[in-house]
């Protein structure tokens, strides 16, 4: 369950790219502190961070360090270890769940989920490997 956080609290963002930058910029304008984890010193969201952790996204200890500095944690993309997130979400306040992450990491599951909610999608087929494809 997500708890309400008020300005002055810290939002942790895994990923310092364009989406992280937009979130950090808006949050700073509202009075929040920002902690960012990204492997690049040159990530575009770094300029808005109060705390910056340079680390790969699969570095469990560094991701947990970000969590310890944060009142709520989010991620800007789906290239994160869902199993690691599953462990961390039991202890820390994540906006997205590991289950949501697992769905967004696989386009077929993503489309199936959208259709289960009656959200229109383009037609698609499920292909597991090259034996599922006929080439003339």
Cite the ranges covered by each PLM segment.
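ATP-binding N-terminal substructure of ATP-dependent carboxylate-amine bond-forming enzymes
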Residues: 1-105, 109
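Active-site nucleotide/adenylate-binding loops and adjacent lid/helix of ATP-dependent enzymes
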Residues: 103-136
């Amino acid at each position: 369950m997500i708890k309400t956080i008020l300005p002055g609290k810290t939002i942790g963002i895994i990923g310092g790219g364009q989406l992280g930058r937009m979130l950090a910029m808006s949050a700073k304008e509202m009075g929040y502190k920002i902690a960012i984890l990204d492997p690049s010193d040159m990530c575009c969201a770094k300029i808005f961070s109060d705390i910056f952790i340079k680390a790969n996204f699969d570095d469990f200890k560094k991701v947990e360090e970000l969590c310890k500095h944060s009142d709520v944690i989010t991620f800007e993309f789906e290239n994160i270890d869902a199993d690691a997130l599953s462990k961390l979400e039991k202890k820390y306040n994540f906006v997205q769940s590991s289950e949501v992450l697992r769905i967004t990491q696989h386009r077929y599951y993503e489309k199936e989920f959208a259709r289960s909610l009656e959200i229109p999608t383009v037609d698609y087929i499920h292909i597991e490997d090259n034996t599922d494809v006929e080439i003339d």
